[in-house]
């Protein structure tokens, strides 16, 4: 299948490109390199540096390459940044997604897989979160993604386009073959930041909040390995190409780990301790958010291969070692 991967020079998009190429699909990557790295783009993919909101460029790419499916990863993802600068998030995540959806419709793209987020649920209760849970985003980031979900659903109802929305929980780890990993500067993902602290790339790791209603007082999250996530996208694409109806799926394992459990896993992988500083809560952090993933497993036949926190952490730490070795 001929595919366009937006944000394909970023963390998840680069893994998706590898997954598609490994399966024999053709891949065009569109990325403005605002946070991505050209070096992260797979050699076998065609790379175009540009803005996902540039409709003239989009039309040319989609028509010239006969694109049948779009996998849309491009966007901004830092929750506190979205609170400080909400209009930038509505531009980058919502307005530009609208431009992409419009060009998909105009050029006859058949399938659209959208990278959304568990942030659309806001602060759910203690139970695993199903796709039918109330949508109450707490940040402009979550709202910007939910708005795109709504636009995509409305466009699909009006046109010959089918889609899958995938709501990610906490993505972590690296390609098992060492071809890709998270290279984002100023990263905020816990596992990456903890690995950086373990390797001395950071002076310490901050833990925000130790008084949550959880067994050890720290937040609990559902961590999904990035290659497993890419394979969920491949399963979504196969589902759509087989005639599946538009739908939405959570992407997580259905099991949560606390911040301190993650810290201990990083210490085990590194073989030593590092400076961990316990601090106050951050506003808007749910105590616990874990995916109900039965729908993804049942409807798309998704079977994760790396659902083990120690495996995920080892991959992330090995990737950080590679990044350190590559520094001049």
Protein language model features and the residues they cover:
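Glycine-centered small-residue hotspots that permit tight backbone geometry or close packing
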Residues: 8, 36-38, 50, 80, ...
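N-terminal Rossmann-like NAD(P)+-binding domain of SDR-like oxidoreductases, especially those catalyzing
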Residues: 1-174
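Conserved active-site helix of classical SDR/Rossmann-fold NAD(P)-dependent CH-OH oxidoreductases
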Residues: 97-98, 146-153, 191-192, 227-231, ...
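Short, flexible, glycine-rich and Lys/Arg-enriched loop motifs at helix boundaries
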Residues: 38, 169-190, 200-221
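Short-chain dehydrogenase/reductase
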Residues: 90, 138-146, 180-192, 222-223
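C-terminal substrate-binding subdomain of Rossmann-fold SDR/epimerase-dehydratase oxidoreductases
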Residues: 193-328
């Amino acid at each position: 299948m001929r595919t366009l991967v937006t944000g394909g020079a970023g963390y998840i998009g680069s893994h998706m490109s590898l997954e598609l190429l490994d399966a024999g699909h053709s891949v065009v990557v569109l990325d403005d390199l605002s946070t991505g790295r050209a070096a992260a783009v797979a050699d076998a993919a065609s790379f175009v540096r540009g803005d996902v909101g540039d409709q003239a460029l989009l039309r040319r790419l989609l028509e010239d390459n006969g694109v049948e499916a779009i996998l849309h990863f491009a966007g901004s993802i830092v929750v506190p940044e979205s609170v400080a600068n909400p209009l930038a998030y509505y531009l980058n995540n919502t307005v530009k997604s609208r431009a992409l959806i419009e060009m998909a419709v105009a050029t006859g793209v058949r399938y659209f897989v959208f990278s959304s987020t568990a942030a659309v649920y806001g602060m759910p209760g203690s139970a695993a979160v199903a796709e039918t849970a109330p949508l109450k985003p707490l940040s402009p980031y979550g709202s910007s993604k939910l708005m795109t979900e709504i636009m995509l659903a409305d466009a699909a109802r009006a046109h010959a386009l089918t889609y899958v929305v995938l709501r990610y929980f906490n993505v972590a780890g690296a390609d098992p073959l060492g071809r890709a990993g998270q290279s984002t500067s100023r990263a905020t993902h816990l596992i990456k930041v903890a690995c950086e602290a373990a390797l001395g790339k950071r002076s310490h790791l901050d833990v925000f909040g130790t008084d949550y209603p959880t067994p050890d007082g720290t937040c609990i999250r559902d961590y999904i390995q990035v290659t497993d996530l890419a394979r969920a996208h491949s399963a979504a694409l196969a589902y759509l190409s087989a005639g599946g109806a538009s739908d939405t799926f959570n992407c997580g394992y259905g099991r949560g780990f606390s911040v301190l459990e993650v810290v201990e896993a990083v210490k085990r992988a590194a073989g030593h301790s590092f400076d961990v500083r316990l601090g106050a809560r951050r506003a808007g952090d749910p105590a616990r958010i874990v995916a109900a993933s039965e729908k993804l497993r049942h409807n798309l036949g998704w079977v994760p291969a790396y659902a083990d926190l120690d495996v995920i952490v080892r991959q992330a730490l090995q990737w950080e070692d590679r990044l350190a070795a590559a520094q001049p």
